[in-house]
From Swiss-Prot:
One of the Pfam families matching this protein, by short name: GIY-YIG
Quaternary context: Interacts with UvrB in an incision complex.
Localization per Swiss-Prot or TrEMBL: Cytoplasm
Primary localisation category: cytoplasm
Lineage of the species this protein comes from: Bacteria, Pseudomonadati, Pseudomonadota, Gammaproteobacteria, Enterobacterales
Name of this protein: UvrABC system protein C
Organism: Salmonella paratyphi A (strain AKU_12601)
């Protein structure tokens, strides 16, 4: 226990009502957040002589101050606890590292509805289907739906300004509601209804309706229409045959847990209308000495009660671990959702199969993660030995990317003891320098990155500069001039020059811009971690540069073609459904646009291709 903190005096001031408490260390940092039905009883338990675990002993030894917030109910306390955990990220709490919102498929409420991927708040009028585990799953589903039920996926701004159908109509991926007469209101509405039923898991209803329409078309001797509907039926059947479907039409999340060597994996399986939409593995940050029960309880609370996660609530949550606060969690989630949410820990039948699947996936993902961590730990230990450092807890690497000096982008990637910390990767757009001056670009990004206050935990042990002596000289100059409140002498600056022909294993490392560098053996674990972070930085920089270049190119390509002024540009984009449609068009198709001659069409075609 802290010698300064007077626990007896503090406990006399604490109420027995429900609430949340925050524990601070001597530096004023929140080190733990907890909730309690009875604050006095819960807080008193921290200051007994026989504490439950070493983790609690270590926590109590650092307490300098405790803040208490009284709430009306336990539910309020639970919500506030998880909001505080998200805000303060205390080191003695189990922390959910991935707090991204989940993507949904959005069916708009327009006269002619469109399909799109959606993340975030659901303000737009329409229907939302999901959640899906990631953007890839949504894009894959949208592409599939476009082939089976060709309703539009274009933005409203494009849809409203069309006078002729775009390429999607020509290849059968859209019914073309943007142009009057191409599709009847009845047919478009019918296809939208099929999409709605399909995404709701009612495949049987879709097939029943399609079969009835096919038979009617055949009876009416409309054989082309019957053949088209037959193809649609076959496409729906092919999709549904591949899916693992429960006849019960379950709407639930299934959570499996694996715990080993101080690391936990929580695997969440998303099931909607009996269909497995996908899954995702999470590796929460677990303080040493934490029991598995606390890991599961804290994860589940953070997963559903923090921010956007509240909008992804299913009707039922299956767990393979019995929670002490199961009733409280279910009540809190039900209150948030405005409907009853069930939390089940002993399922049977299909639900037990789901849980076994989630548990197996959690165990498999944990084995893979532990193997990867073992590798990265060995590599960082080897690098620390080479650099004569006690340990490397954080490392950052910089790279510059541009095309002939244009659209310069600098990247910064971050590794910690577990490897890449992608949530902290950053890109910097570089401006105000001579085009192609990589030294000036490096100088600028380092000043922007380090010329300000930095939390102690965010100060890197090693800063890797990709580019060799010249770039390292820039880094040394920047750090020599820094006037910052943190210890600028803490990071070790290390330059890395690529080998001959940029071959991996031939890199040269530099501590100083002058003199000879040194190399590591090609099989050195220390070299492997340097190559890993350098390649990550390089890829991150190139990715940002390509996005920036594409953005500029999309707005300026047509402007550079002689004979294509604002009116012709507008006409070309309008008739071709945007720049991508124009890029895919032939010379003959471009020449059909009003005001575009055969000669100009050829010039436009070759300008876009080359």
């Amino acid at each position: 226990m802290s010698e300064i903190f007077d626990a007896k005096a503090f406990l006399k001031t604490v109420t027995s009502q429900p609430g949340v408490y925050r524990m601070y260390d001597a530096g004023g940092t929140v080190i733990y957040v907890g909730k309690a039905k009875d604050l006095k009883k819960r807080l008193s338990s921290y200051f007994r002589s026989n504490l439950a675990s070493r983790k609690t002993e270590a926590l109590v030894a650092q307490i300098q101050h405790i803040d208490v917030t009284v709430t009306h109910t336990e539910t309020e306390a639970l919500l506030l606890e998880h909001n505080y955990i998200k805000l303060y990220q205390p080191r003695y709490n189990v922390l959910l590292r991935d707090d991204k919102s989940y993507p949904f498929i959005f069916l708009s409420g327009d006269t002619h509805p469109r399909l799109a991927m959606h993340r975030g708040a659901k303000h737009a009028k329409g229907e939302y289907f999901g959640p899906f585990p990631n953007g890839y799953a949504v894009r894959e589903t949208l592409a599939l739906l476009q082939k089976i039920f060709p309703i539009r996926q274009c933005e409203n701004s494009v849809y409203r300004n069309r006078s002729r159908p775009c390429l999607q109509y020509q290849i059968g991926r859209c019914l073309g509601p943007c142009v009057a007469g191409l599709v009847s209101e009845e047919e478009y509405t019918q296809q939208v209804e099929y999409v709605r039923l399909f995404l709701s898991g009612k495949d049987d209803q879709v097939l029943t309706q399609l079969i009835a329409r096919m038979e009617k078309a055949s009876q009416d001797l409309a054989f082309e229409e019957a053949a088209r509907i037959r193809d649609q039926i076959q496409a729906v059947r092919r999709v549904t045959e591949k899916q693992f479907v429960s006849n019960a039409g379950d709407d639930l999340d299934v959570i499996g847990v694996a715990f080993d060597a101080g690391m936990a994996c929580v695997h969440v399986l998303f099931i909607r209308q009996g269909k497995v939409l996908g899954s995702r593995s999470y590796f929460p940050k677990v303080p040493g000495g934490t029991e598995l029960g606390e890991v599961v309880e804290t994860f589940v609370g953070q997963f559903y009660l923090q921010g956007s996660q509240m909008r992804t609530l299913p009707g039922e949550i299956l767990l393979d671990f019995n929670l002490s606060d199961k009733t409280l969690l279910a009540d809190s989630l039900s209150e948030l959702a405005g409907r009853r949410i069930h939390v089940q820990t002993k399922p049977r039948g299909d639900r037990a199969r789901y849980l076994k699947l989630a548990r197996t996936n959690a165990a498999t993902a944990l084995i893979t993660k532990l193997s990867q961590q073992s590798t990265i730990t060995q590599r960082l230990t080897a690098l620390a030995a080479v650099l004569k450092l006690p340990a490397i807890k954080r490392m950052e690497c910089f790279d510059i990317s541009h095309t002939m000096g244009e659209q310069t982008v600098a990247s910064c990637v971050v590794f910690d003891a577990n490897g890449p910390l992608r949530a902290e990767y950053r890109r910097y757009n570089i401006a105000g320098i001579t085009p192609g001056d990589d030294y000036a670009a490096m100088n600028q990004v380092l000043r922007r990155r380090y010329g300000k206050a930095i939390e102690e935990s965010k100060i890197p042990d090693v800063i890797l500069i990709d580019g060799g002596k010249g770039q390292l000289a820039q880094a040394k100059a920047v750090f020599a001039e820094l006037d910052v409140p943190w210890d600028k002498h803490c990071p070790l600056l290390l330059g890395v020059a690529k080998g001959a022909d940029r071959k991996a294993g031939l890199e040269t490392l530099f501590f100083e811009p002058e003199g000879e560098g040194f190399s590591l053996p090609p099989d050195s674990p220390a070299l492997h971690v340097i190559q890993h972070i350098r390649d990550e930085s390089h890829d991150h920089a190139i990715g940002g540069h390509r996005k920036k270049r594409a953005k500029v190119k999309n707005t300026s390509t047509l402007e550079t073609i002689e004979g294509v002024g604002p009116k012709r540009r507008q006409m070309l984009l309008k008739y071709m459904g945007g720049l991508q449609g124009l890029r895919n068009a032939s010379v003959e198709e471009i020449a059909k646009v009003p005001g575009i001659s055969q000669g100009l069409a050829e010039k436009i075609f070759w300008s876009l291709k080359h």
